[in-house]
Amino acid sequence: MEQNKHTDVDTLSKVTEIFKALSDLNRLRIMELLEFGEASVGHISHTLNMSQSNVSHQLKLLKSTHLVKSKRQGQSMIYSLDDIHVSTLLKQAIHHASHPNEGGS
């Protein structure tokens, strides 16, 4: 980032919404599963042992912040991470959490 160049407030507001969405364990579990590929609500529900209504609710929140996207496949909705930036953000957060002493002090 250039010196004296600040990110605009609207963008920072969107960033806070992204971090709010990421602050839930079940949403992170869903996103980590989607890191391996696309999945339906039923598959996510079964794999993570969560109710389908809870999975659908969490996906709606993740979709509202553009962390996941969906497409129709027959009668099912198939979900995936929105783009490579989301995948990178998730991987970096997991790496940061699993290596707490790399930053010094």
Predicted regions and their residues:
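Alpha-helical DNA-recognition elements
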Residues: 61
